[in-house]
Amino acid sequence: MPFEEAMKRLFMKKICMRCNARNPWRATKCRKCGYKGLRPKAKEPRG
């Protein structure tokens, strides 16, 4: 199902809580600043 693949591509990322860089899902530290505080990308809209 293409929709499922698109969701994985868009949301299977981690976001650095210091510099907001997008990182791979399996990352343990940020690729830009080296910070270890990563969160999964939000799947629900805010607001």
UniProtKB/Swiss-Prot annotation:
Lineage of source species: Archaea, Methanobacteriati, Methanobacteriota, Methanomada group, Methanococci
GO MF, one annotated term: structural constituent of ribosome
Covalent S-S links between cysteines: none
InterPro entries for this protein: Ribosomal_eL40_arc (IPR023657), Ribosomal_eL40_dom (IPR001975), Ribosomal_eL40_sf (IPR038587), Ribosomal_zn-bd (IPR011332)
Name of protein: Large ribosomal subunit protein eL40
Gene Ontology terms: cellular component: ribonucleoprotein complex; ribosome
SUPFAM superfamilies in the record: Zn-binding ribosomal proteins
Similarity comment: Belongs to the eukaryotic ribosomal protein eL40 family.
Keywords recorded for this protein, A-Z: Ribonucleoprotein, Ribosomal protein
Transmembrane feature ranges: none
Superkingdom of the source species: Archaea
GO biological process, alphabetically ordered: translation
Pfam family, one: Ribosomal_L40e
